[in-house]
Each structure stands twice: as C-alpha cells, then as structure tokens.
Amino acid sequence: MLALTFATGVVDAVGYLRLDQVFAGNMTGNVVILGMAATGGGTGLPVLGPVVALASFLAGAATAGRVLRTAAPGWSSRCGALLGGVGLVLTATALGPAVVGADTSGARAGMASSLALAMGAQAATARHLAVKDVTTVVVTSTLTGLAADSRLGAARGRGALRRTAAVALIVAGAAAGALLCQVHEGLAVAAAACVVLAVTALGSRAAPATTGAPSTAPPTAPATASSTAPAMASSTAPSTASSTAPSTASSTAPSTVLPRP
C-alpha cells in the first residue's frame, strides 16, 4: 500500500503540471477548485478537468466496490484483478500522448479521466484491504493521526513509522513525477503503472490461494461430536457392564435358592 501511495504522487504531479491543474487522486483539491470557480473568485481556474476527474474517480471507486462487495477481508484474487486493471489503465494512458497527443483540452480531459478512474479503483481496493492510515490517495487523515498520537498529542505513538512513510512516499512520488514530466508526461505515467503492476504481482504471489468469496465452511461441532462419542462409549460402556453385572448376580442369585425339605 505504501508503494501505491508513491504511484499516486506521480499521477497527481502529472495531472497538476500537464493536465490543467487536475488532481487524479486527491479529490479534495478538485472540489476546492470547483468551489472557487463556481463563485468566480478565481479567474482562469479549470472546470472541465476537475469535473471529469471527479466523475471518473467516483465511477472507478463504485466499480471496485461492486467487485469487492462479497469478497472476504484482506487480499484476494479480486484485489489482484482490480489492481492489475489499474496498472493496465495507467499503461494505456501512458501511451495516449504518444498516439493522439495531449495538446488539446479534449485530449487532456480524456487523460485526466482515465487517470482518475484508475485512482478511484485503487482507493476503493485500498479501503477494502484496510491498512490503517494508508488510503494511497490522500495523506490528510495520515497527518492527523501522526500528530494526534505523537508525544505532543495523546502520546500513543502507534503507527508513527507507517504514517511517516506514507507522507514521505507521496512527496517522493510527486517529486519523481515532476522530474519525469520534464522529459514527457507519458514517461511519468508509465513509471506509476510499473509500480502498481509490481505491487499486484507481489501481492498475488504472497496470497495466491484465496478467491475473495466469504468462507462457507460448516461448523466444527459435528466433527467434535463424532470424534469424542466413540471414545466415550468405548471407555465407559465396558467398565459399567463389568462392574455392575457380577455384583448384581452375586447378590441376588443366593436369595432365590429354596431350602431342602
């Protein structure tokens, strides 16, 4: 999940620097931009890109949620399939500028849409995996937990290393994305795709057995009964018969003999 946070930093750098200040993963930024643009408070603020990105992000998250609706908690083949799909979408998006270019507003909106679709599916998958404080797309809640549980706050100190790593990786991803965008935005998206596909391969190798369906195994009570009943019968029945039968016979038989005439 931390590696996916790095990939989000790369993708958001591409969106902001090359796609008219659009955030593909951080929807808070898009909502704020749309709010300012709606009031006319900011001239030249983009509208089409943030709207398209927001709608595509929701579509990706809803699709992943539907796929994982009946999945068991934790990693499963469905998680692997979804993250693999995210990697493929990012790969196709990386090839887009080389094929159709990214010089028109329509091309940029289409690229922002595919990136946001992928990030929405990734975020929903990360939510299902439920790694604490690692949403892969934002670090606001991560920073909140880091500060609140620090020595200056509640002094719990739980998850500090993981939270710090998540923040550092999204910063590193944004920096890497900005550097790669100086060469070509497609190269930056391709780097993010490689990270996601690597995470998918490693996750599938680590947990290949589960299919994502909830467990329907019968309870273990019948097995316990079947294993203990013969033992109880074999241990109690002979001892009861051997201990009670002779004593009964010896105590009752003499009393029934008639005296001789």
Predicted regions and their residues:
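Helix-to-loop junctions at the C-terminal end of transmembrane segments
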Residues: 60-76, 176-177, 181-182
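Symmetry-related core transmembrane helices of the 12-TM Major Facilitator Superfamily/SLC fold
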Residues: 83-89, 93, 113, 187-204
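Long, intrinsically disordered low-complexity tandem-repeat segments
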Residues: 213-256
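A membrane-interface helix-boundary motif in multi-pass transporters
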Residues: 75-81, 178-194
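Cytoplasmic-side transmembrane-helix entry/capping segments in multi-pass membrane proteins
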Residues: 75-86, 108-110, 133-135, 164
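Hydrophobic core of transmembrane alpha-helices in multi-pass small-molecule transporters
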Residues: 2-11, 16, 20-23, 89, ...
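Hydrophobic/small/kink-forming positions within alpha-helical transmembrane segments
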Residues: 54, 58-62, 91, 167-175
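Substrate-agnostic recognition of the 12-TM MFS/MFS-like secondary transporter fold
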Residues: 31, 41, 117-174
